[in-house]
């Protein structure tokens, strides 16, 4: 099925949010699975709300997620002549007509229909008047008066709409601009789109678009409407649920493969498998496993999944990824140094911001180590500082200052003085780290180096 063509068509009226990102991922995976094409189209016909900064942000988010597209980027704002040519074709064939009813009169018609318990719609006053162009006039589709529209949705199964409930929708506004449904149908048809996967908030547009496909003589694509993503409380997802725009997740320190993996699982499944490499998703993705029930967004699970990917990433690659976050903490460190540190600390972080912060005490000079007051009071007592001084002497005497040497020096001090490890280690740890936590003490000492470790111990003894 190399003839499969899918598309993603965001409006540049805001940053790419996770619902839109999931739609893009589904369409990208379907195209890549069948060796087809994935088209990216910017729906910027709303000139007042569309902003270049949002277009740039959407494109950057797509690239960050690894969603490449085929062919040129399409802008609807550059295709008005094409849309108008198809509107003219509909007028010539009798499938559309000019309407001069002002908006307030149309709204009055809708109110009258509501009062009668009917679907609010335009009453077709201008359908048979044979009007032509004129100021304030719009072009409407001449929809069939009766019948049903039935299609096989890839997610929902058979879906039917009564044509009598549909409006004679506007195709060209009074200012000459084409409307959303007209532009979408013309674009999808002329770009050869075969499959349209989108959120089920678009389901009500589908019968209108099918009427346009039929009026223009275009072949219908396969439609699939995936349920919206809900919050943990099963209400519409919003920022209060912890949902962010894709660009915010990047700034927050998530890895793109984690976000892609998580969003795919919010609406698609392959048995009980939770973790997928991108290549696996391309291989296994299919519309038959798209879920018809809405999934709930769980920020904790996303954090857990991102932590998994942090720990699976090579030290060199993870160092490259965390470098800008370390720089944001105020440190000028090269990636080779970070590649030594991240294996010790990635178990203690679930995102790159956390990873940069938990490594902070390893990057500051001895004079700037921040001491936790409670840890100092508990561990750096007079006896504790005496043990720190003793360990300091043992470390200073080492010929080779490496992990094994540091471990032996501490062990020899403990054994030589008839002590237990727990009597010595907490004080030395607080002296080196500034707190009780952290990875293995000898590992950290070896990475800090002799001079830095001795300076930290000297400072702690002097407290």
Curated annotation (Swiss-Prot):
CDD domains: GluRS_core (cd00808)
Keywords, comma-separated and alphabetical: Aminoacyl-tRNA synthetase, ATP-binding, Cytoplasm, Ligase, Nucleotide-binding, Protein biosynthesis
A biological process term (GO) from this entry: glutamyl-tRNA aminoacylation
Motif ('KMSKS' region): 236-240
Major location (coarse): cytoplasm
Residues that bind ATP: 239
GO molecular function, one term: zinc ion binding
Domain of life: Bacteria
Its EC number(s): 6.1.1.17
HAMAP family for this protein: Glu_tRNA_synth_type1 (MF_00022)
Oligomeric and partner information: Monomer.
Family per similarity comment: Belongs to the class-I aminoacyl-tRNA synthetase family. Glutamate--tRNA ligase type 1 subfamily.
PANTHER family attached to this UniProt entry: GLUTAMATE--TRNA LIGASE (PTHR43311), GLUTAMATE--TRNA LIGASE, MITOCHONDRIAL-RELATED (PTHR43311:SF2)
Function: Catalyzes the attachment of glutamate to tRNA(Glu) in a two-step reaction: glutamate is first activated by ATP to form Glu-AMP and then transferred to the acceptor end of tRNA(Glu).
Name the UniProt record assigns to this protein: Glutamate--tRNA ligase
Species annotation: Nitratidesulfovibrio vulgaris (strain ATCC 29579 / DSM 644 / CCUG 34227 / NCIMB 8303 / VKM B-1760 / Hildenborough)
């Amino acid at each position: 099925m190399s003839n499969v063509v899918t598309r993603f068509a965001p409006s540049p009226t805001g940053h790419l949010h996770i619902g839109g990102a999931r739609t893009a991922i589904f369409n990208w995976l379907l195209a890549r699975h069948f060796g087809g094409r994935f088209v990216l189209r910017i729906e910027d016909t709303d000139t007042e709300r569309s902003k270049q900064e949002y277009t740039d942000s959407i494109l950057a988010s797509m690239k960050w997620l690894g969603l490449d597209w085929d062919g040129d980027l399409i802008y609807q704002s550059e295709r008005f002549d094409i849309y108008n040519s198809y509107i003219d074709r509909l007028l010539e064939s009798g499938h559309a007509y000019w309407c001069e009813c002002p908006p307030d009169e149309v709204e009055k018609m809708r109110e009258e229909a509501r009062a009668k318990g009917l679907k609010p719609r335009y009453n077709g006053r201008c359908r048979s008047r044979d009007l032509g162009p004129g100021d304030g006039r719009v072009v409407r589709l001449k929809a069939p008066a009766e019948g049903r529209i039935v299609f096989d949705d890839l997610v929902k199964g058979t879906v039917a709409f009564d044509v009598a409930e549909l409006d004679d929708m506007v195709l060209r506004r009074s200012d000459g601009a084409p409307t959303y449904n007209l532009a979408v149908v013309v674009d999808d048809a002329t770009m050869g789109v075969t499959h349209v996967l989108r959120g089920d908030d678009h389901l009500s547009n589908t019968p209108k678009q099918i009427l346009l496909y039929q009026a223009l003589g275009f072949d219908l694509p396969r439609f699939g409407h995936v349920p919206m993503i809900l919050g943990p409380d099963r209400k519409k997802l919003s920022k209060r649920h912890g949902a962010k725009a894709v660009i915010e997740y990047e700034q927050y320190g998530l890895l793109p493969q984690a976000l892609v993996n998580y969003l795919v699982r919010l609406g698609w499944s392959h048995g009980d498998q939770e973790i997928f490499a991108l290549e696996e998703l391309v291989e296994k993705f299919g519309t038959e496993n798209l879920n018809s029930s809405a999934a709930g967004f769980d920020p904790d699970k996303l954090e857990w999944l991102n932590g998994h990917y942090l720990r699976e990433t090579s030290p060199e690659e993870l160092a490259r990824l965390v470098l800008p976050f370390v720089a944001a903490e105020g440190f000028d460190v090269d990636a080779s140094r970070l590649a030594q540190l991240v294996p010790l600390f990635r178990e203690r972080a679930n995102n790159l911001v956390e990873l940069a912060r938990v490594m902070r005490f390893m990057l500051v000079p001895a004079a700037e180590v921040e001491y936790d007051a409670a840890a100092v009071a508990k561990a750096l007592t007079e006896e504790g500082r005496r043990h720190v001084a003793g360990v300091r002497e043992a470390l200073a005497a080492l010929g080779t200052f490496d992990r094994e040497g540091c471990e032996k020096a501490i062990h020899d001090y403990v054994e030589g003085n008839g002590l237990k490890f727990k009597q010595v280690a907490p004080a030395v740890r607080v002296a080196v780290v500034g707190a009780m936590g952290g990875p293995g003490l000898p590992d950290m000492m070896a990475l800090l180096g002799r001079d830095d470790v001795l300076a930290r111990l000297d400072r702690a003894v002097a407290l």
